[in-house]
């Protein structure tokens, strides 16, 4: 009897394992004729592989697409062409995509340590309308970044700056004597730049965005260029400048309408936009994700053209842990929604709302059943009660894709004061996420370290902010410029270390931690924007190592605690910030500060 039971159990386990294996299908990209470290264009091969996977796999079946370790080259030719409207990016279409993943379930892309290298102007990876997908173990880079890295070799106050482009930079001096960068299918003229210390890779002290005028440039020797109109005494010989424009057409990874996505040990070394842009997604985990250089000996000083990671109109929980973010031209993480501006009151239940910023429109804003609230733009005060969408449709187009305006009908009557003349915004509360940002390193980047604008629980802990150049942590909210929602109600900032933030001035950088909602008319504000309860924002058990005065700036907060923090001063740089106060508070109540 015992033998029979053991046999039955063994058979049952065997069948269970077989059943699991049968539900997991593994593909290897080499099956499709693509080998690692070959010069073959990967774009059409990967496109065909994805089409085959979609055709062969049953709904719910687990699928793994593996890339044997090595380098894979993706060109525009043969890539997937799509019309994408991407939050906080240039809305130029069509977009060319190297690895386009759409309407997938239970898919894992495993690079096994591979390098995915792109050419031209492409979105390396897109993931849309997908569930339970994993991207892991690969890096993204471009053979010819659109940012031109140069090193100052001479700086003569009379003759101008002489510089040498990095070895990988292809360039020309145009017919009208302007330095231009070249790549596969693109030409760039550079108006601005960020200066890095040649030895430390820190952004050069008190430089912020620098002009790079190259009109009249000429070669004085092979790959040595004199720019007589470029004069800046701060750029001593040895300084490295990342010359750039302001365009941001293509993120490294674009995610939209996904549920339960994990990015594990993925590195973005360059993208002509943000490293990762996720919009209207639910539950995202980043573990070991990086927007970073290729190690301490990487000759590059820059990474992405904009933010490292950016989450627009997401919900569920965003987890970002154990990451490295360095050298990017904007924040390590930005979490927000988007206000629609009220441009017409149709009746007591219907408004027309509009996306206002030129880099944020064309994508879905809300759905029937979503909860919303209304804000007066001038004072950033809530008006009326929360409401619920019963119907929403694009107003200026026949479809959501590419729309800027929406007709929205609400369940309850709208407050009589809300109209198109006085400046009101609509905030979607359903599409707001909880955030955990933990165990990350942020260093040597332009602008700010992190930016959070969500009413859900936000925890920022155990991170290292090392020479972020601007504010390390910003809590914002803006219905006037970027139109990025919204108020923070439950924020904990703990056990972080801040080393010499604020070496430069950028937007909203009033202190190492800056709570800075954009409020045009603060003096007439009656309510408070951030907080709303005792300890709505808690800053505790952190270490600040700083050369300058401002540690905390706060505006329009109800419920702020600063306690058990250590503040150390150093002499690495000369204090220069206009804010000479350790703690500068404007319209803040229910506050407790103790070092």
From Swiss-Prot:
Protein name (Swiss-Prot/TrEMBL): Alpha-1,3-galactosidase B
This protein's encoding gene: glaB
EC primary class: hydrolase
Matches recorded under Gene3D superfamilies: Single-stranded right-handed beta-helix, Pectin lyase-like
Membership in a protein family: Belongs to the glycosyl hydrolase 110 family. B subfamily.
The keyword Cytoplasm appears for this protein: no
Native source organism of the sequence: Bacteroides fragilis (strain ATCC 25285 / DSM 2151 / CCUG 4856 / JCM 11019 / LMG 10263 / NCTC 9343 / Onslow / VPI 2553 / EN-2)
Cysteine disulfide links: none
Stated role: Alpha-galactosidase. Removes both branched alpha-1,3-linked galactose residues of blood group B antigens and linear alpha-1,3-linked galactose structures.
Keyword Chaperone: no
Reactions mediated catalytically: Hydrolysis of terminal, non-reducing branched (1->3)-alpha-D-galactosidic residues, producing free D-galactose; Hydrolysis of terminal, non-reducing linear (1->3)-alpha-D-galactosidic residues, producing free D-galactose; Hydrolysis of terminal, non-reducing alpha-D-galactose residues in alpha-D-galactosides, including galactose oligosaccharides, galactomannans and galactolipids
